[in-house]
Each structure stands twice: as structure tokens, then as C-alpha cells.
């Protein structure tokens, strides 16, 4: 199986807490919930990092990411970060004529990535996306996050002090539901949820939003039927 999606992750229990909900509404003038756009995501990041600060005596953060110079840092942007902000065009499969990486394609061939050559890799949406990545990493994530790689940062939300993560892979699901984790209830159910990715201000209806590695799913006959049914529902969710 090489099929996974990049989605929004959040602490459902904190987002459902009446005290936190009331405090957020008083500060920002709207209800705490899954953010549809990056502006709301930033509000929530600021809320938990700055205005909440601690929950149950533990310092909490409104954002998690990674920034160490490493091959995995490339995935942070190639996995559709620029297009989530609104870089690229409407069109199948990944934006046409300008795709999710900001590369202009003509007759199935790349012809340019810069604005001067018809691309969008250094356009307003791409610049905005990069700046927000830097700003949020510095302002709202744990101090160690900029020095982490993809693999090092992935398990961090399971420690229980992260409120949300805009760039989270479903491949981390198995590591987030183990017994005894701070993000798992006593009955084994998760305290967290995932949701569709919020989009930036340059994004328009019809543009690609989010990312998935399209591969294959293998459901073994030897797997109990109830677990196979659950896996089939999960497969439909991450590919929808």
C-alpha cells in the first residue's frame, strides 16, 4: 500500500471543550471549529499558543511542522503546499496549464515555472505560502520544530501538546491510536480527528486542494470481516 493523503489534523476534545470554545468566540468573534481557510487556521494557532498556553499544566501549541535542511523538506512543498495557497490553475489532473508546483505545461511538456515564463512558482500565492510556512513555524510551533525532519516531527502530536496541524499525513494514523498515548481515550478511541485541508486566499473553487499519493489498497481475505469493512471505509475517506 502506497496510498496516503495529506489532511488537516486537530484535537477534537479541545475543540469541543465548552470553556475553550467560549474563550475563542469572545476573542475572535466566531466559533472554534475546523478551519476552512488559512486565516482561521492562523487564529486557532495563535489562540492555543498565545491565549491558552497551558492545558492541564502542560504547555500547548497551536501548530506543528518541521524545517530541518533534509531531503524530506522537499516533500513539505511538493506535496501541494503552493497549490493549497492558490498557486496554479483549475484543470485536470493537477492544474492546467499551470500545475500544483507552479510549473506551466504545454503539450504535456514543462515550459516554465517563473512568472516571467508563464509559471507560478514565484507568484503571489507561492510567496504567500512560503512566508506563512516560515511565520507559523517560528510563532506557533514548539521551539524544536525548525530543527526536525519529516520523520522526527511526525510522532510529535501524539505527545498530547499540539492543537492542530495543517500539513499532516494519514500515514501517521497507526502511530496515533496506540494504547496509552496522550491523544487516545481510555476506551481506545482517538481524542483527535482529521478533516479536509484549509486553503489560502488565492485558492479558487475547482483548484486542487490537499495531496494524496495514489497507489493501491490490499484487503486480505484472512482479515476479519469487520476490520476489512472498516479499512474499506477508511480507504474511501482518504481518496475522496
Q: Which residues fall in each region the model found?
A:
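Periplasmic solute-binding protein
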Residues: 1-30, 42, 66-113, 206-220
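Structural recognition of the beta-strand scaffold that forms the well-ordered cores
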Residues: 6-10, 62-65, 163-168, 193-196, ...
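Short helices/loops that flank or line small-molecule/ion binding pockets
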Residues: 15, 40-48, 52, 151-165, ...
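A local structural motif
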Residues: 22-33, 116-120, 134-148, 161, ...
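Glycine-centered hinge/linker elements that transmit conformational signals in sensory
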Residues: 38-49, 84-147, 197
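Bilobed periplasmic-binding protein-like "clamshell/Venus-flytrap" ligand-binding domains
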Residues: 50-67, 240
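Extracytoplasmic/periplasmic substrate-recognition and gating elements
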Residues: 138-141, 180-240
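A ligand-binding cleft/hinge motif common to bilobed small-molecule-binding domains
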Residues: 167-186
Amino acid at each position: 500500500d502506497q496510498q496516503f493523503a495529506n489532511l488537516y489534523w486537530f484535537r477534537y476534545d479541545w475543540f469541543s471543550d465548552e470553556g475553550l470554545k467560549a474563550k475563542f468566540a469572545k476573542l475572535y468573534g466566531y466559533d472554534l471549529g475546523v478551519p476552512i481557510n488559512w486565516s482561521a487556521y492562523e487564529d486557532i494557532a495563535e489562540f492555543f499558543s498565545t491565549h491558552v498556553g497551558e492545558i492541564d499544566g502542560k504547555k500547548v501549541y497551536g501548530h506543528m511542522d518541521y524545517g530541518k535542511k533534509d531531503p524530506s523538506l522537499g516533500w513539505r512543498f511538493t506535496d501541494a503546499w503552493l497549490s493549497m495557497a492558490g498557486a496554479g490553475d483549475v484543470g485536470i489532473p493537477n492544474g492546467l496549464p499551470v500545475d500544483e508546483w507552479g510549473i506551466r505545461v504545454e503539450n504535456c511538456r514543462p515550459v516554465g515555472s517563473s512568472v516571467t515564463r508563464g509559471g507560478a512558482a514565484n507568484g503571489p500565492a507561492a510567496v504567500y505560502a512560503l512566508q506563512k510556512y516560515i511565520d507559523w513555524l517560528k510563532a506557533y510551533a514548539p521551539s524544536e520544530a525548525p530543527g526536525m525532519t519529516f520523520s522526527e516531527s511526525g510522532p510529535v502530536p501524539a505527545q498530547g501538546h499540539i492543537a492542530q496541524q495543517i500539513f499532516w499525513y494519514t500515514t501517521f494514523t497507526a502511530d496515533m491510536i496506540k494504547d496509552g498515548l496522550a491523544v487516545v481515550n481510555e476506551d481506545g478511541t482517538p481524542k483527535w480527528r482529521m478533516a479536509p485541508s484549509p486553503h489560502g486566499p488565492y485558492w479558487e473553487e475547482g483548484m486542487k486542494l490537499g495531496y494524496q499519493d495514489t497507489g493501491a489498497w490490499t484487503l486480505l481475505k484472512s482479515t476479519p470481516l469487520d476490520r476489512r469493512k472498516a479499512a474499506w471505509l477508511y480507504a474511501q475517506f482518504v481518496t475522496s
